[in-house]
Amino acid sequence: MERLVERLASAETRGDAILLLGVTAAFAELFAACRGHGRAFRLGPASRVVDTGGAKGLARPLSRAAFLRECWTLLGVPGYYCVNEYGMTELCSQRYDSALDDRFHGRGLAPRRLVAPPWLRTRVLDPDTLAPVKEGDAGLLCHHDLANAGSVSVVLTEDIGRAVAPAGIEVLGRAPGAPPRGCGMLLADVLAP
């Protein structure tokens, strides 16, 4: 983290725009390091943040709103320039937060949602019956990815979410009793003594 903080300071001094990509849990570590050093940055105005993996494995939960607040407070990157990615090893395609696209297309007040390329569809299913839920209700996320031509094209997850218009989803968490999964969990392994 020390080297990253030094590089952020250097980028800030030069006014460089940077792209920070990482698992959400690593950003939580960066935020803690910034606070520990009493340091906040004002990165170049074209700087962007892309995070993935959610807050799994964190000792202290970090909500999406808190994450966006920390990006602004500690990095100087506004929330509309922070993009969340949702994907998994089993899928060839990913979903991305709509905020940046919404901003550039004049939809600034549209609800944040995870949008996908046209070949990826997600259905929201009742956990007990696997029937589709009513519009707006939460359920298990079932992804149909046509890019998975060489393997299975349908992946039923233990992620709970809901459909969000237009053409998006919101991930709410994991099904009760489902083990945590994802790249955010790897950081805990890396940081373990």
PLM feature spans:
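Active-site glycine/GP-rich loop and adjacent strand/helix microenvironment
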Residues: 1-193
